[in-house]
Design a protein with these regions (language model features):
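C-terminal motif of bacterial Sec signal peptides marking the signal peptidase cleavage site
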Residues: 15-18
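N-terminal segment of the mature soluble domain
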Residues: 54-103
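Short secondary-structure boundary motifs at beta->alpha junctions and helix caps
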Residues: 161-194
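Post-signal peptide N-terminal segment of mature Sec-exported envelope proteins
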Residues: 28-45
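Surface-exposed short loop/turn segments
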Residues: 102-162
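Positively charged n-region of N-terminal signal peptides that target proteins for export
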Residues: 1-5
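Envelope-exposed proteins and targeting segments
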Residues: 47, 96-98, 148-153, 171
Length: 206
């Protein structure tokens, strides 16, 4: 379970790459909340937590502008959810029974599709004089487009289950979606999925 957060992120990336960007009517239809946890963890045994006041950002585009203006709002949503489940926030991480980290990933993705503009195979075979097959024709128009997706990852890290200076992630939640629309609409959708991560984790309580 030490690499639970990383495995979850990789799995999500593979899953979402098979879904984007077609098959839905609105950007909200692409929003998803995914959670995973250590089935051997006793979440009722934890009592206090600490959480940094900033989000760690990662991007696959070196020119991406990382905006921290919503850090406080996102961290507050995460903090409130843990408090609602009976945990107490402390300022000193050394006295906390678990640490909460929040990370954000931004990806520029490229996809394409081939437009089969001919009507049927009869048209294709009859296109070349004499009906002979020509390996270079007809031409299939290829459309290439880019879209930006983002993920906010919450990791719940036990401070008592360390070994070889490695931490143990006992719960992870990911809010994923397309980064389209106004900044406020994007943050509203992110917060909705963050809340959903906790809703679908009923075992996560003191």
């Amino acid at each position: 379970m030490k690499h639970l957060g990383l495995m979850l992120t990789v799995s999500l990336a593979l899953f979402m790459s098979s879904c984007y960007p077609e098959g839905a009517d609105t950007v909200e239809d692409y929003d998803v909340a995914i959670t995973n946890y250590d089935k051997g963890a006793d979440f009722s045994s934890f009592s206090t937590f600490a959480i940094p006041d900033t989000i760690v950002y990662f991007a696959n585009d070196k020119n991406a502008k990382l905006d921290h203006q919503f850090d406080e709002q996102i961290i507050q949503v995460v903090t409130d959810n843990f408090i609602k489940r009976g945990y107490t926030k402390v300022e000193n991480p050394e006295t906390a029974s678990f640490i909460v980290t929040v990370s954000a990933f931004s990806n520029i993705n490229y996809s394409y599709y081939i437009d089969n503009w001919y009507n049927n195979w009869n048209w294709y075979w009859g296109w070349w004089p004499g009906g002979a097959f020509n390996p270079y024709y007809p031409w299939y128009p290829v459309s290439v487009y880019a879209y930006q997706s983002g993920s906010v990852v919450i990791d719940m890290i036990s401070t008592t289950a360390r070994s070889d200076n490695k931490v143990k992630v006992i719960w992870s939640g990911i809010a994923d979606g397309l980064l389209q629309g106004t900044q406020q609409s994007i943050i509203n959708r992110v917060n909705t999925q963050l809340n959903q991560c906790f809703i679908q984790s009923p075992y996560l309580k003191k």
